[in-house]
Amino acid sequence: TGLASVAGGFMLLVPPSEARVYMTPGEAAKLFWGNQKLIPISLKLSRQQRNDIKEASGVAVRASKMAVWKTESGGWFVLDSVIGKHEYIDYAVALSDKGSVKAIEILVYREGYGDAVVNPRWRAQFYDKDPSRQLTHGKEIMNISGATLSCRHITDGINRLTKMWELVFSKV
């Protein structure tokens, strides 16, 4: 029930042997929101919403169903994944009630290299970024040599999620 079962359903891919699990979705939720109650939001994006998000963020929305929870204080807990170079990177994001990034944690990293994106200093670049700005990998968000595609795709994912907040979550 609750976060564990929905989050468990979200993690559809079986990590290959080189996958590194840094945190569970439940641990990330606790880290981000403490003991606040997380209310699961049943969210299925329409084709029009997916197109609008793609147009606003420049990033395609692959799935119509999202793993999303709203906090008692109006914040959001979102589970998402992006492709690294060849494999998926699962991550969790906390968004404020205004859609700005409060925190990001890498949950599972499946690539054989390039996992420097788990570095807290690199992830901190996203904090306080909101839907009003399109983040650019290599400009607002620094690259990490050896993790270029992971950096770029996580940046794209954050842009997609903040625009998703603006166009969808904020209206829930």
Regions found by a protein language model. Name each.
Residues G2-E18:
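N-terminal export signals
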